[in-house]
């Protein structure tokens, strides 16, 4: 058994990773997942089985997540031109070129934290740049 697990699972296998990790961990298991992962009846079944997440942190800024093999390990910049350019009007359009710095991503992500045996409500917050949690405060009165 281990105290903690932090992982970015292959997204098609996330449910299997959650099931397995919750069995292995004494403390907590945290997963970086697309926000849309929550919106599924399959997830409700998983939460009934392993318990609901203790915490969800939505990444307020969309991270760039190009495949690591395309990034220079020292500079963090692209080490090659986009290998899959699209043709538009007879011209190749590249998403990036060698030496470019990755920009913002197009997908919303979140950290989901499971604690074995947790039965309370799920706490949800947002992380901004630098990993700082921004507390949710209602700015208008409910109707």
Where are these regions (language model features)?
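Class I S-adenosyl-L-methionine-dependent methyltransferase catalytic core
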Residues: 1-143
């Amino acid at each position: 058994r281990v105290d903690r697990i932090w992982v970015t699972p292959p997204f098609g296998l996330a449910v299997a990773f959650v099931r397995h990790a919750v069995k292995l961990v004494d403390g907590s298991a945290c997963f970086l997942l697309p926000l849309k992962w929550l919106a599924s009846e399959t997830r409700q079944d998983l939460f009934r089985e392993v318990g609901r997440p203790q915490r969800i942190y939505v990444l307020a800024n969309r991270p760039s997540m190009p495949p690591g093999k395309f990034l220079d390990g020292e500079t963090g910049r692209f080490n090659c031109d986009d290998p899959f350019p699209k043709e538009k009007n007879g011209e190749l359009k590249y998403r990036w070129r060698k030496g470019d710095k990755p920009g913002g991503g197009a997908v919303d992500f979140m950290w989901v934290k499971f604690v074995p045996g947790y039965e309370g409500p799920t706490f949800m917050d947002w992380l901004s740049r630098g990993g700082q949690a921004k507390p949710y405060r209602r700015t208008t009165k409910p109707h």
